[in-house]
Amino acid sequence: MAVRPGLWPALLGIVLAAWLRGSGAQQSATVANPVPGANPDLLPHFLVEPEDVYIVKNKPVLLVCKAVPATQIFFKCNGEWVRQVDHVIERSTDGSSGLPTMEVRINVSRQQVEKVFGLEEYWCQCVAWSSSGTTKSQKAYIRIAYLRKNFEQEPLAKEVSLEQGIVLPCRPPEGIPPAEVEWLRNEDLVDPSLDPNVYITREHSLVVRQARLADTANYTCVAKNIVARRRSASAAVIVYVDGSWSPWSKWSACGLDCTHWRSRECSDPAPRNGGEECQGTDLDTRNCTSDLCVHTASGPEDVALYVGLIAVAVCLVLLLLVLILVYCRKKEGLDSDVADSSILTSGFQPVSIKPSKADNPHLLTIQPDLSTTTTTYQGSLCPRQDGPSPKFQLTNGHLLSPLGGGRHTLHHSSPTSEAEEFVSRLSTQNYFRSLPRGTSNMTYGTFNFLGGRLMIPNTGISLLIPPDAIPRGKIYEIYLTLHKPEDVRLPLAGCQTLLSPIVSCGPPGVLLTRPVILAMDHCGEPSPDSWSLRLKKQSCEGSWEDVLHLGEEAPSHLYYCQLEASACYVFTEQLGRFALVGEALSVAAAKRLKLLLFAPVACTSLEYNIRVYCLHDTHDALKEVVQLEKQLGGQLIQEPRVLHFKDSYHNLRLSIHDVPSSLWKSKLLVSYQEIPFYHIWNGTQRYLHCTFTLERVSPSTSDLACKLWVWQVEGDGQSFSINFNITKDTRFAELLALESEAGVPALVGPSAFKIPFLIRQKIISSLDPPCRRGADWRTLAQKLHLDSHLSFFASKPSPTAMILNLWEARHFPNGNLSQLAAAVAGLGQPDAGLFTVSEAEC
């Protein structure tokens, strides 16, 4: 049977559609030419064609085609037909021409694009059919968007003179689409259209044509595309001005001494920002011409004046000599105390007196003398034992235990003990007068090479100064401060959140030969797949810098952070201001919130307020709320609960239920209260809480029973069953008693450490050298579960010392020395004598 020629394209489209619908197979297609004799005006014409698009993260992209007239439209991607079931089709009729119109949409996923290997890019195009033939659309390329983290070139700090040109190079990270670059000056955007003195080159370098004093700032290169925004390290640019002399003044009148003078100042311009001072003198003196000089004989008044001036000068010189002598005497006394370290490292045990050096009679060891004075010193480096055995074995766990009293005696033959003076110098002093005076949030002390420890009670914040971290011969006053978030401006970008308190230790710039360990709590739920954690440090200019990206540590880094479930331990040789900041990588990232319910201890009115606090699950946040509630006269009415708050952008809701209407009436006008997501996630707002006000029907009502729910929308939640007597129920008051941390806020020398000094030294000397059988510091780290970053320990002169320091920071003051002794003894060292300490060594 003959078929009319005009029906062939339609039949071909129907057959092709039936084949795709039935088999779902993908095959190459041959596009037909227009049918001979057909009207070319009726070929499909595309109203919408697919365009190039980028896949961001894991979100699929949508491609759209629309053609008229069209009886069929199919997508072809990388030469293969897309299955019909993956097409979303809409048919309509063009209003003006009455021709059939078709619109087709498909989704392309990241997995489909990633299946294409090699140099070929993933592309898709549409093929439309009509009764007159077929038409192809343009190709649309689908690319996966990304932006690397590391800049190929970052700007470097510069010091330039006034009116000199400045070029700050910046090569952004590799990315698709290519990153756009902008520059920040002290966090303000640099706009070349507003400042003709600056421009940005095609290579993204920032150029300042002529440096001005106002150009002194921190410059940051920012790269961004549709995926992310990256910041380079800030580069400090200092524009300095060298000083120049002003013109000489006129000569002064001729004086009685037949001289006159003229002066000038280093003010044309004055040196700025570290510029060089003017060279030469600012005063010029010359003899006067003889006829201008007036000669007069010195009278009795002048002689008396000269004698008085000479007497004053002599007195000042004598006073200066006395002060120098007193200073040298004190310094000599302190050096004699510190120079013979056996007095300190032997635990102040008595040995025979003899001069230690022929040329220095001040260096003496100590001999027992029952007739002399005795000075007590808190702590010891070596435990004493009154039994007949002269040796201690480390393999017995109790040998690492401290003495009950922890006190040892130092015998000295002088009436005024040098040790007493030395210990008094190492005690805490009221020294840092310029620091915040909040006594509960600050501690400070004086330390030398023996080390020590600073603690802010009931906050989980401490600073461990290991032995030999301070150079011998140096004495530092060191402080430790907890800051309120509103007092310190910590900029948080994007989804970043503060996970720890903001803590300062200082003074900055002191020389340390070993890393100190800063311990502080955090409220993040550690998960490498959910969090990007960064340690931030404030620079001397006031800006915050990322000094460590957890999980990307390198042995050469100056910092290391041991992250645990609720605390972090920061190794640093540079003191300063630190904070732990997290950036959520997925909605699974969660912060721990502690929920606390408070109510008045005494209620004299009919109204009764229940305050629900939602705070970071850290000791310092708990301490602040407890102190606040003590001032308000509040009491805890339920045991605290922990809620996991996720980065889902959903708010926190609180509601109260099952209030007995015959006894109480709720004054809440809505069914629930909310705390906005960003108020919690930001982490810088304190005392976040909601108040539920209940009213007693009768003044005699004292029993309260209800339920209180706290939950994140589409997330975790907690419920409290409240059932207590508001006048006499205090069973939860004991939960408010803050744990008293052992010792004082500042511990100096041996009393700051659990491990006796000589035993510590023997462990270090035994485990530092590599051992073929594995009985070295690596095995000790594994036994103590400190093997997450062995390369950091290996980069230090004594890896064992780093491990023991971290153990001290984690376990003070309640560490189990028996477990440590068992771990060391279980290494199987062949020479047990390495862990033996004799009375002579003590």
UniProtKB/Swiss-Prot annotation:
It comes from the Eukaryota. Pfam families: Death (PF00531), I-set (PF07679), UPA (PF17217), ZU5 (PF00791). GO terms for cellular component: membrane raft; neuron projection membrane; neuronal cell body membrane; plasma membrane. Residues 26-306 are extracellular. Residues 155-234 form the Ig-like C2-type domain. Residues 605-623 are annotated as: Interaction with DCC. The chain crosses the membrane at residues 307-327. Residues 1-25 form the signal peptide. It is a single-pass type I membrane protein. The keyword Metal-binding does not apply. Residues 761-841 form the Death domain. Down-regulated in multiple cancers including colorectal, breast, ovary, uterus, stomach, lung, or kidney cancers. PANTHER family: NETRIN RECEPTOR UNC5, NETRIN RECEPTOR UNC5A. Receptor for netrin required for axon guidance. Functions in the netrin signaling pathway and promotes neurite outgrowth in response to NTN1. Mediates axon repulsion of neuronal growth cones in the developing nervous system in response to netrin. Axon repulsion in growth cones may be mediated by its association with DCC that may trigger signaling for repulsion. It also acts as a dependence receptor required for apoptosis induction when not associated with netrin ligand. This is Netrin receptor UNC5A. The gene is UNC5A.
